[in-house]
């Protein structure tokens, strides 16, 4: 392990002692904001320091085993102990480097997920509906909540565009690599000749802004239009101009919300989506630069990139960024995404570790 990393770990250990001392003071709870901040820092530092303690213990075991080598009667035993200690040190070294990777401040946040039908017309809209169900089922598996924010339904079923909000700790960390082009190959229900068609959808995953203050929205930059909501919602929703369209004039971004029961609710939700989109645009600009520097295919924020193909006749899913192919399409479409998301996170961590070593 590099001396600079060892020094950093020692500093973290010292800081944990300091934070523990501060939390133990009688006046610690007099400033609740600072108390919460210290508690959060304590929770973040503890696992790193514990692994570092185990690392130093393994190093001590290695030194003890090497001393035993000089004893002829203990030589074989010592050799086994040395091998075990070295393996443990390597394992803990890797774990420590992962723990020291820079944290994405958005990882624990709720998300907005936008799914837009692309090439393929009605079939693409149906696939957008399938993707929404896939992410909704994945959310259920994680005990997250799903709310439909805005939906532009297709005449044949599915969606031309749908925006959902997923509420749950770590939602962004698990789904942030889903942004990009998703392609489906299958025989449409309307196809009488049994020919396979290719359709596509674009997915955008955006962390929800903590507060609207995170993004400075100048009222002069916004144009708000109201109109009558269409689609489901009963009699009341179509009698008033409850739907809201907000246009961000500097960027041309347009957000529509009409699924709420009032104009006020729709405007509030539209502002949240707009804030998330503006935050996301800034984040993707930074990600693209960082990804280009390390020649990364994951986390580049490039929405035009085709990231995954769902082939129904062959029952397979292929993620093109990491050359991962799974022959369990039905399970994936039912929300069994863990194998894919785990592999993407692992690859992203490996890229960051490689960058740390450069």
From Swiss-Prot:
Residues the record lists as N5-methylglutamine modifications: 235
Residues annotated as transmembrane: none
Pfam name, any one: RF-1
One MF term in the entry's GO annotations: translation release factor activity, codon specific
Cellular component annotations (GO), alphabetically ordered: cytoplasm
Main location: cytoplasm
Record localization: Cytoplasm
Annotated Gene3D superfamilies: 3.30.160.20, 3.30.70.1660, 6.10.140.1950
InterPro entries: PCRF, Pep_chain_release_fac_I, Pep_chain_release_fac_I_sf, Prokaryotic/Mito_RF, RF-1
Post-translational changes noted in the entry: Methylated by PrmC. Methylation increases the termination efficiency of RF1.
Record keywords, A-Z: Cytoplasm, Methylation, Protein biosynthesis
Domain of life of the native organism: Bacteria
NCBIfam families per the UniProt record, alphabetical: prfA (TIGR00019), PRK00591.1 (NF001859)
Similarity field: Belongs to the prokaryotic/mitochondrial release factor family.
PANTHER family in UniProt: LD18447P
Function: Peptide chain release factor 1 directs the termination of translation in response to the peptide chain termination codons UAG and UAA.
Protein name per UniProt: Peptide chain release factor 1
Annotated organism of origin: Neisseria gonorrhoeae (strain NCCP11945)
């Amino acid at each position: 392990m590099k001396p600079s990393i060892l020094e950093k770990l020692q500093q973290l250990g010292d800081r944990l002692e300091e934070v523990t001392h501060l939390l133990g003071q009688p006046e610690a709870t007099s400033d609740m904001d600072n108390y919460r901040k210290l508690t959060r820092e304590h929770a973040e530092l503890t696992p790193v320091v514990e692994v570092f303690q185990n690392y130093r213990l393994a190093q001590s075991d290695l030194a003890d085993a090497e001393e035993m080598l000089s004893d002829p009667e203990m030589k074989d035993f010592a050799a086994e102990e040395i091998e075990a200690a070295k393996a443990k040190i390597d394992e803990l070294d890797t774990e420590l480097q992962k723990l020291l990777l820079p944290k994405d401040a958005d990882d624990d946040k709720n998300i907005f997920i936008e799914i837009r039908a692309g090439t393929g017309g009605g079939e693409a809209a149906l696939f957008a509906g399938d993707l929404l169900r896939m992410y909704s089922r994945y959310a259920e598996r994680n005990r997250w909540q799903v709310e439909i924010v805005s939906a532009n339904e297709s005449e044949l079923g599915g969606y031309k565009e749908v925006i959902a909000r997923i509420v749950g700790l770590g939602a962004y960390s698990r789904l942030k690599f889903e942004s990009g082009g998703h392609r489906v190959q299958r025989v449409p229900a309307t196809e009488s000749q049994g020919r396979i068609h290719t359709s596509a959808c674009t997915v955008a995953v955006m962390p929800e802004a903590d507060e609207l203050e995170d993004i400075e929205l100048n009222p002069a930059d916004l144009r708000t239009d109201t109109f009558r909501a269409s689609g489901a919602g009963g009699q009341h929703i179509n009698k008033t101009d409850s739907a809201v369209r907000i246009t961000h004039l500097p960027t041309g971004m347009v957000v529509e919300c009409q699924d709420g029961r009032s104009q006020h609710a729709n405007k509030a939700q539209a502002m949240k989506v707009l804030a998330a989109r503006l935050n996301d645009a800034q984040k993707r600009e930074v990600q693209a630069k960082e990804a280009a520097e390390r020649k990364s295919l994951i986390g580049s924020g490039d929405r035009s990139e085709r990231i995954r193909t769902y082939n129904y006749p062959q029952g397979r899913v292929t993620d093109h960024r990491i050359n991962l192919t799974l022959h369990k399409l039905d399970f994936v479409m039912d929300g069994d995404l863990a194998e894919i998301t785990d592999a993407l996170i692992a690859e992203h961590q490996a890229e960051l570790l490689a960058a740390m070593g450069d």
